[in-house]
Amino acid sequence: MTQLRFHAKRLFNGQQFVDDQVLTIIDGVISDIDQNTDDVDVKSTGLVVPGYIDLQVNGGGGALFNDAPSVDKLKTIMSAHAKFGTTAMMPTLITDKVEVMAQAADAMAQAIAERVPGIVGIHFEGPHLSLAKKGTHCAELIRPISDDEWQVLSRKDIGQVIVTLAPETVSTADITRMVKLGIKVCLGHTNADFETAQKAVDAGATGFTHLFNAMSPLNGREPGVVGCALLNDNTQSGLIVDGHHVDYASCQLAIKTKPAGGIFLVTDAMPPVGTDMKEFPLYDRTVYVENGKLTSTTGELAGSSLDMATAVKNTHLKLKIPLEEALRMASLYPAQYLYANNIPTRGELTIGMQADMVVLNDDFNVLETWIGGEKV
């Protein structure tokens, strides 16, 4: 048994700000909280907040998950994002061959078996997408679902699974089948009309991937997928708040429209995070990094160079969202989405929760990241 007494001079526990809290952490889990500051192992003078949870991470630290997926690559990506406060992530495989999907699943199974800190499951973004809204995904690899994909998706050793799909390319029966397997189904890269999207939600889809991006827009006569996302209070949407993917006013509109918890922050991060890379290969093209914006040679946005710390700062400072709500959008709300049918173990710093913590300075930059009571 390992025990640590951690003194937070100021703590945001997921619900409110409190001062002089001492967290007793046993084997990585918060077992008690008191105010006896005489007997502590660690003193923190910054603001201690719940660790950030990113449900859409393609890469980081110079590595792209799609490029020869392995557990070492997962560790590289996780390490890069941990520096910016991410304590749990869903490594994301974009549209690729089924053989690469299987390799990614093998890497995830190994990471789960080895208890690699911060790796909680896998997000398959594609390949069952709309060609009309493919973005930077490879058109030649977009395809209907087959038995080969079902073999990968049905595995029980790869942690939580998220699948992003276009509902016009996948039947409602297949969506329901995924949900029964415990898969979280998100709608994205879709040109579906409102009716088709709504049928997918009725069949069990509960999320929308990078809201506003690569989906049919809202207009007066056709609400589209965006309208479906905003109208259904029982769904949650990921939002990229980097100033490139979505106008800040549109971000504000979505947050005001959805009930509390309806929007969570994601990065859609690519290899440049944590590096000074200016370009990198993706499929058969090159992606260029300029002023934080990633653009492929064919002109599309190609993911982001965003980290979760910057996403939180942008949400608070650019969108004028209260700090406590911006922090929930990076921790509590993605945890609620991920663990909707189970007892959550992340997202708050309360008794019984995993001790995933981030220490911030006055500018909301990350000073320390702790995963399971261990500094990383």
Can you name each region flagged by the protein language model?
Residues 1-37, 370, 374-375:
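N-terminal metal-binding scaffold of metallo-dependent hydrolase/deaminase domains
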Residues 47-48, 55, 66-118, 141-155, ...:
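Alpha-helical scaffold segments that flank or form the walls of functional sites
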Residues 228-237, 255-267, 273-360:
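His/Asp/Glu-enriched, well-ordered alpha-helical/loop segment
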Residues 124, 178, 208, 315, ...:
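Conserved, mostly hydrophobic/aromatic
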Residues 58, 79-90, 131-156, 199-211, ...:
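Active-site gating loops and adjacent loop-to-helix segments of metal-dependent hydrolytic enzymes
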Residues 58-60, 75-104, 117-130, 157-168, ...:
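Divalent metal-dependent hydrolysis catalytic cores, especially in the metallo-beta-lactamase
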Residues 154-275:
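Active-site core of metal-dependent hydrolases
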